[in-house]
Structure formats: C-alpha cells, structure tokens
Amino acid sequence: MLHTMIQKACKKWFSSDECKIKNLISYMISTGELRDAQIEAIKTYLFLKIACDNKPLYELFCNGAFNSLSEEELNSMELSTLTREILLTNKAALALYEYASQKNEKGEQVSVKLTDEIKKNPQNINYETIFKKIFYGVTYSDYLFSLPMGAGKTFLMAAFIYIDLYFAMQNPDDSRFARNFIILAPSGLKTSVIPSLRTIQEFNPAWVLPEPTASEIKRQMIFEVLDENKSAKKSNRTKNPNVQKLALHQPFEDLTGLVAVTNAEKVILDGLVRAEQGELFEESSETKDREANELRYWIGKLPQLSVFIDEVHHATDGDIKLRSVVNRW
C-alpha cells in the first residue's frame, strides 16, 4: 500500500506542468515495444529520480512527498484537537496515518490498530523511526520494482540503464543519474550471468530513446562479465581476474557506460558472520573471501554507480549478506 501512495503522487506529477518527461514517455509508447507494466515502472522510476531527487524512500515519506490528505479532509474526520494539529504539522505523522487508513483490494483497512494508536497517542510516536524500520534502515536510494512473471524484468533493467546514461550525459554533474552499473545475478542460479548480460546487450535502446541518441549511447557502452573462478597468474596489480577486468578501465574519474554483470556470490563473503549485536563482520582468511573482498573494493570505486539486483529472492539466506555488501558501496 506504500506503493499505492507513490503511484498516486507519480500520476499527479506526470499530469502537471512540472513534468518534463511526457514527450519521452510518449515516444516509448509509440514504439509499441514495451509492455504497460514496463512503461508504468519507468514513469515511477523517473518520478523518484527527478521529482523526488532520488532520495531514500524513508526520507521521502517523512517529508510528506506522497501525502494526499488535505486539511479539509482532516477537518472532516473524528479526531482530537491534538491529533489533528500533529497531523497538520508533522508530515511523517500524516504519511503514516494515510498509509494505515488505506483500504486493500478486499476493502479492508491496512491497519486499524495503527490509526487508533495515532488517534490516541499521536505525541508519543516516533514516526521517522517507524519509516526507517519499514525500509530496513536503508539510507540510500533503494527501489524495488516487482513485475509479473514474463513481463520483462531484465529488459526493464536495460531500459533504466539507458535512461540513466541519457540524463547523465546531458548533465554530467547530476548525481541523481548513474554513469556506471553493476548487475548482481541470483547467486543461487549458477548459469544466470551470461543470459542476463546477453539480454541487456541485445536490448534495443531505440525502444526508449529516439535516434540518433540511442545508437550514440549504445556505442559508448562497455560490457564486462565478472565470472572467472580461478586466480590469474602473478600480476603487479591483482591476483583476481575479475578485478583485472575492472582495472583495465582506469582511470575511473571519467568512466561512463560500464555495465558489469556477476553472480551475487562473487561479492558475498562466506566469512561474513553476525556478531551478538547483530552486525555483520568479516571473519575469514579463505582465498575465495579475499577475492570477494577485493572485487567489492574495486566495484565500490566506480563513479556514480548504480547497483541492480536481479531476482534477489533467489539468494535465500545470502540476501542479508548481500545487503551488507551493497550498504558498504
């Protein structure tokens, strides 16, 4: 239901004069190559990037970016003076109240318990902390796009990559848009890397960008598969062959258009263990873990990096470790 609030705000923005991507979306629709679900995902993606400045979701909810309840609507509700005052002055409180008040597809309220608590004790609730917990304490932009089976999730990632590069090349100093990309294929699927890369390589950017821009951007793309298992022979730079592939693209300052694909397991340390306090830390001297650490370090050096995790639900118990790795980047 949080998604419902985002979509409502997105539609309002898209129909306003502030939205400058209408022609771009119209072009995508005119090509007839993208499914409706993909178009809607792209609209939402650009709304979060442009209108919302690519800020973390918890911050956007706390700032009332998706609030739609008006003062008139609040005044018509049975609320105490204190509750109404807090909802009118605290955007995070209003966001949480609006979320809990929504109805699902069955007509059931999302959380009667939560709205009742806000009505009874609005001054005792730490609204910002609640939103941080909802979004797992993530303090960077982290968006999940869930499409139906067969709706083209990998193509959608490719579309996002080209769209980011399009805006990044227009405004190199705009940090909202990525210049380089790492795609983490499911660690549980050993043969998923090559198909993922091939799908992205074969994606026709003219589906989302007009020519000659589409072809110009594609010519600047660099694709790397980081799937080597064995250490390379002695080298002055590194013993990890996957790191060698990245090192060839130095200096990184002006690097733009790199798309690297690897299995999630390549960057997850088996030696990541949980301390009593709940934190993950490294406790291993295994070669595999040293190589994973080295690869993570070099990936983290890539400028304006966007991380795509493909079907992360396949990672099972590895998803917690993977989140820890992404947090460090």
Locate predicted features.
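RecA-like P-loop NTPase motor core of helicase/translocase proteins
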Residues: 1-329
